[in-house]
């Protein structure tokens, strides 16, 4: 009783502690194995996602890769997609009209006080004709030398306005998910601007629970996990082995893995009715080994779509909402720790931040303590709604 009285008396002085509960979705070189994706989530993405994607040549690599999967005979209609949404996944290619066609050309502040691609996205999403659109993607051409902080700040403007709980009226019933993206290799190696820029974007997405299509990471590794960015390497998968730009990991991998599904998707080798991946922007002519760059990115797109549709990516079972001690049960010990955490987070760490954000609003504060108190008193009368946590 004394413990509960103390808790009640201290509730009013609790601080608001960010929970960082919503896990980031990072789509990188580890997300290119189609066999990992359950069929049901491929179907769910086709049924529920409506994507608008804006890009120029480098960004087209994703679409070229998706077309390779779509046209590969062994897959049938499994990876069907259409620009109009008439069949398969609904992806409106180059679907965000505006002053500038990609992030690189739109790296400035326009008359609305934001980047032109934010203005273009707002114009698209504010039209009731586009209330079905629930995923927005913008890609870079060259990221080299661009203002990455400006990019992140302007992406966050869109997130704050149109994502779940956003300030724009359409967010209440038609929320939108926004995909961040890194930029392609240009032979700089790890000491160059591009690597630093990509790392800044990655860290931002990890810290803020964002969705990232890691364009750069996907092309930095071959399918066996060998890393090439530090050789250095370029956007066509060329890299320096002995002399400047003398090798290509896509060509080498295909030569060493003839007859594999990935090699056949890339080259069309011994596949009746299929001549390989079509010409991949900046990467090679149709069927060349380095068009694997597009194939891998197309595979990763489907991995991302399944995640956006609700697939957990095969992650371990989520923790129990309210179980801030991590002992597998919810009791007054959890309530005391949650209270102490709100007063002094550093001195009273909890097992998993997600489990303390009881109302799922992104913060741990007085409301979460009150909900947990109510739940302990009357479990059937209170709902625990931690983001990405089981009850």
PLM region descriptions:
Residues 7-15:
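Bacterial N-terminal signal peptides
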Residues 18-22:
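Sec/Tat signal peptide C-region and signal peptidase I cleavage site
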Residues 25-134, 285-286, 296, 300, ...:
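N-terminal carbohydrate-binding/catalytic regions of secreted carbohydrate-active enzymes
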Residues 106-192:
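Extracellular-facing segments of soluble proteins and assemblies that are Gly/Ser/Thr-biased and enriched
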Residues 183-224:
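Substrate-gating cap/lid alpha-helix
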Residues 222-273:
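Mobile gating loops/cap/lid regions near enzyme active sites that modulate substrate access
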Residues 252-316:
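Extracellular low-complexity, Gly/Ser/Thr-rich intrinsically disordered linkers
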Residues 316-391:
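Cellulosome-associated attachment modules in secreted, modular CAZymes
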């Amino acid at each position: 009783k004394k413990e509960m009285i103390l808790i009640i008396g201290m509730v009013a002085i609790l601080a608001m502690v960010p929970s960082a509960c919503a896990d980031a979705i990072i789509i990188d070189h580890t997300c290119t194995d189609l066999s990992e994706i359950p069929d049901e989530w491929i179907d769910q993405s086709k049924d529920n996602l409506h994507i608008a994607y804006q890009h120029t040549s480098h960004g087209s690599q994703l679409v070229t890769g998706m077309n390779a999967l779509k046209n590969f005979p062994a897959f049938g209609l499994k990876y069907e997609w259409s620009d109009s949404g008439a069949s398969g996944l609904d992806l409106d290619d180059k679907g965000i009209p505006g002053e500038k066609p990609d992030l690189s050309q739109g790296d400035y502040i326009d008359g609305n006080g934001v980047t032109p691609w934010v203005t273009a996205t707002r114009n698209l999403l504010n039209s009731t004709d586009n209330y079905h659109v629930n995923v927005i993607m913008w890609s870079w051409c060259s990221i080299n030398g661009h203002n990455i902080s400006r990019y992140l700040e302007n992406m966050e403007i869109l997130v704050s306005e149109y994502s779940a709980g956003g300030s724009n009226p359409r967010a209440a019933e038609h929320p939108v998910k926004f995909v961040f993206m890194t930029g392609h290799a240009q032979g700089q190696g790890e000491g160059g601007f591009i690597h630093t820029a990509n790392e800044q974007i990655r860290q931002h997405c990890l810290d803020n629970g964002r969705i990232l299509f890691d364009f750069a990471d996907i092309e930095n590794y071959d399918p066996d996990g060998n890393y090439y960015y530090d050789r250095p390497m370029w956007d066509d998968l060329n890299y320096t082995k002995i002399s400047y730009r003398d090798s290509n990991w896509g060509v080498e991998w295909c030569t060493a893995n003839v007859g594999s599904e990935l090699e056949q998707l890339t080259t069309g080798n011994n596949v009746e009715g299929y001549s390989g991946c079509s010409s991949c922007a900046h990467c090679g002519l149709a069927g060349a080994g380095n068009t694997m760059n597009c194939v891998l990115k197309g595979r990763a797109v489907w991995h991302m779509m399944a995640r956006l549709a609700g697939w957990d990516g095969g992650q371990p079972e989520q923790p129990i909402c309210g179980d801030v001690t991590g002992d597998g049960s919810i009791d007054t010990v959890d309530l005391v720790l949650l209270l102490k955490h709100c007063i002094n987070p550093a001195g009273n760490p909890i097992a998993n931040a997600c489990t303390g954000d009881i109302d799922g609003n992104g913060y741990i504060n007085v409301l979460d303590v009150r909900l947990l108190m109510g739940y302990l008193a009357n479990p059937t009368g209170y709902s625990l709604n931690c983001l990405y946590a089981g009850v």
